[in-house]
Regions:
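Transmembrane beta-barrel strands of outer-membrane/channel proteins
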Residues: 188-192, 218-224, 255-259, 320-324, ...
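Outer-membrane beta-barrel translocator/receptor signature
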Residues: 136, 148-151, 162-241, 247-251, ...
Length: 414
């Protein structure tokens, strides 16, 4: 073992020298006067954030209630937001699936292709796209609106006449469309299910120009499915295209169009008889259907919009939208009525019919929103106006075979 103390002595000397070297700096720091820095104010708008970018079940802001980007705590109404992540995780591929899982909303499918939505005891007929829309002509929805085009769905329960023009004590359903992204993204989702269900959806988004000032997005899909009901089949085709262009640093122009076709073979029209002629309850197989093999119900929806957004001074923003929605429906349906005999099953009669429906809606919406100072406080203000027009052509025809006797449902093959 070495008894030489030289290494320890050198370490002590080095540490002492380092401490002495830092003392003048410490003394200078303690002796200097505190310096006040100039105040720096940082302001920024929350901006629109797509729910698909968050991969969350929670949306940061909602615009359905006030056209202002408010957090859920700031909205003075009951609001539920169904995000893209939730729709994907639970395979909520149509609006029926979405609203069935929404608090305070009841979905009633009276037949295979006709649905009623209710909230707080009233029918829901206020539907919007990006906050623009008008009340539906009928309280029921024909066909199934697919959710492949939407980033999220916002549901405001209770009256919302301030933003819709016609208040309803039920609810307002706002479909927030997907928008183009600056980065290139692409996805394909393939789904299979019971009764030969097949579904595929492709989604491509990204910059169109080298500078990124023009961006585009295309969503296309196809679905085909059967049912536990005899002879029933539904086929859907969807397409959505949207373009965004930065006209200036503060001006954004958006153009978009969507089309969806939903073609159903052998849809139900009416329901199975509940009672036999002797008053006892019927008991049919789960797959029993009164539909004929020639009946059909085809629905087509066209959805087009042009939107111009201008950022103004002082945190203000102005938005103008022209929106067109057209729903076309063609159907040949077969209804059976009467009370069958319990022993023979006979007693039902035919009621064939044909329907053509065409609904065209136009909406022009313009508003501005921003902050202002009053009484030493900052307030938010929305100013705007909306114009809308709806035209409906509804035709119904009834067949010659009304009242003709039919075979028992246990033998009915369409």
């Amino acid at each position: 073992m070495s008894l030489n103390p030289e290494p320890r002595f050198r370490r002590k000397t080095l540490i002492t020298a380092m401490m002495c070297a830092t003392l003048p700096g410490l003394a200078a720091a303690q002796g200097s006067e505190p310096k006040a820095l100039e105040a720096l104010d940082v302001t920024a708008s929350r901006g629109q954030v797509a729910s698909e970018a968050t991969e969350s079940y929670i949306s940061g802001a909602s615009t359905t209630s006030m056209k202002m980007e408010l957090s859920h705590r700031e909205v003075p109404q009951a609001v539920t937001v169904i995000t893209r992540e939730q729709m994907d995780d639970f395979a909520q591929n149509d609006i029926n699936d979405v609203l069935e899982g929404t608090t305070g909303v009841t979905v009633e499918s009276v037949e295979t292709d006709r649905t009623y939505y209710t909230s707080r005891g009233f029918d829901i007929n206020n539907f919007q796209y990006d906050g623009v829309g008008m009340p539906a002509v009928y309280d029921n929805v024909q066909g199934e609106l697919d959710t492949a085009f939407f980033d999220r769905v916002e549901v405001v329960r209770g009256a919302n006449g301030l933003m819709t023009g016609s208040g309803s004590p039920a609810a307002t359903v706002n479909f927030i469309r997907k928008r183009p992204t600056a980065d290139t993204n692409a996805s394909v989702a393939v789904t299979g299910g019971s009764w030969d269900k097949k579904r595929i959806v492709g989604d491509v988004s990204g910059a169109v120009s080298e500078s990124g000032a023009v961006r585009g997005r295309v969503v296309a899909g196809y679905e085909d499915k059967g049912s536990y009901l005899d002879r029933y089949n539904n086929e859907k085709q969807m397409f959505y295209g949207v373009l965004e262009a930065d006209l200036t640093d503060t001006t954004l122009l958006t153009l978009g169009h969507a089309i969806q076709t939903s073609d159903t073979d052998s849809p139900l029209w009416g329901a199975l008889p509940l009672f036999y002629s002797d008053g006892s309850a019927t008991d049919f197989a789960r797959s029993t259907s009164t539909a004929s093999d020639w009946s059909y119900w085809d629905n087509t929806q066209h959805n087009s919009f042009v939107e111009l957004r201008q950022e103004l001074a002082g945190g203000w923003r102005a938005t103008g939208t022209v929106f067109r929605l057209e729903n076309e429906s063609e159907s040949e349906l077969f209804y059976q009525y009467g009370t069958p005999d319990r022993q023979t099953g006979e007693g039902l009669k035919a009621y064939p019919s044909q329907y053509d429906l065409d609904v065209e809606q136009w909406v022009v919406d313009a508003y501005a929103t921003g902050p202002f100072q009053l009484a030493d406080r900052t307030h938010e203000l929305v100013l705007g106006a909306s114009w809308s027009r709806s035209e409906t052509v509804d035709e119904a025809r009834y067949g010659r075979g009304i009242g003709n006797p039919l075979p028992p449902l246990t033998e009915w093959d369409g």
